[in-house]
């Protein structure tokens, strides 16, 4: 399975073009792209710019990917660096979606921030959590408050392992009690698939299972499930005959574009946007 994982650095189109160029350096000479599909935040932009065959909303792509690993999936928990969402599945279709509405400070990226502040890589910081004896209780509050709690715990002699485990618990508690707003973890479902880059952290996965009492499925491609789902959709919609509408690599190499900044007039905030 080919994958390309990168921050978009504020330009999803430029990053996508970089990924496609990388794909073509690895494609066998007798292979070609016959169907394409975009998903996620830049779905419409990428589809239009590169003339892709399809585009699909992120929730549907996540469902396709989750169902590949568990055909009976009835709940998908997705925790990324900046957002978290819960997708409930009913009768093999997306029934409801809940996500963090404004603040992203309780999402996965704050574990990375804390790890760096303690001079640990994310991977080593996560491993420490697995050997915690007394995880500190950080609750479900904002990162600003957690910072002060962590500093206080350090003053009181808390081990790095206990801090890391406490943060892993906190991410899950934020997802369950602040975003999904459940009172009984049993309401989540019986076939749960967890995904998003944050779940590469074994401590976060274990925290989820301990809090909910449910054994979840975590695919080994947890961080790219949206893209994997889009690939499955493209394969399903291919008729086996038609040529892809996607721009050829030569045309992609020749593609030029410009960006301008303006203010969105969709509401009274008049936010600055790039076009």
Protein language model regions, located:
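Glycine-rich phosphate-binding loop plus the immediately following alpha-helix
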Residues: 9-11, 91-134, 223, 232, ...
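Glycine-rich phosphate-binding/hydrolytic loop that grips phosphoryl groups
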Residues: 64, 111-113, 220-247
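Adenine-nucleotide phosphate-binding core of ATP-dependent small-molecule kinases
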Residues: 148-177
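Conserved small/polar residues in nucleotide/adenosyl-binding loops
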Residues: 273-275
């Amino acid at each position: 399975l080919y994958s390309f994982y990168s921050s978009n650095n504020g330009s999803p189109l430029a990053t996508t073009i970089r990924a496609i160029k990388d794909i073509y350096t690895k494609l066998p000479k007798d292979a070609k792209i016959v169907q394409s599909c975009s998903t996620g935040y830049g779905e419409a932009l990428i589809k239009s710019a590169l003339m892709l065959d399809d585009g699909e909303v992120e929730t549907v792509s996540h469902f396709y990917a989750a169902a590949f690993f568990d055909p009976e999936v009835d709940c998908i928990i997705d925790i990324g660096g900046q957002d978290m969402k819960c997708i409930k599945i009913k009768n093999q279709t997306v029934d409801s979606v809940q996500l963090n509405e404004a603040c992203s400070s309780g999402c996965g990226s704050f574990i990375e921030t804390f790890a760096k502040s303690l001079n640990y890589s994310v991977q080593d910081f996560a491993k420490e959590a697995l050997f915690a004896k007394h995880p500190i209780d950080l609750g479900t509050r904002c990162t600003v408050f957690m910072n002060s709690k962590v500093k206080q715990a350090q003053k009181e002699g808390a081990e790095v392992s206990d801090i890391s485990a406490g943060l892993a618990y906190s991410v899950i508690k934020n997802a369950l009690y602040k975003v999904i707003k459940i009172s009984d973890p049993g309401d989540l479902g019986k076939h749960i698939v967890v995904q998003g880059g944050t779940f590469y952290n074994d401590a976060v996965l274990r925290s989820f299972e301990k809090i909910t009492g449910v054994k979840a499925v975590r695919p080994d491609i947890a961080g790219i499930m949206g893209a994997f789902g889009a690939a499955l959709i493209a394969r399903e919609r291919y008729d086996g005959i038609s040529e892809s509408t996607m721009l050829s690599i030569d045309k992609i190499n020749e593609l030029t574009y410009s960006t301008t900044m303006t203010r969105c007039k969709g509401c009274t905030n008049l936010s600055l946007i790039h076009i």
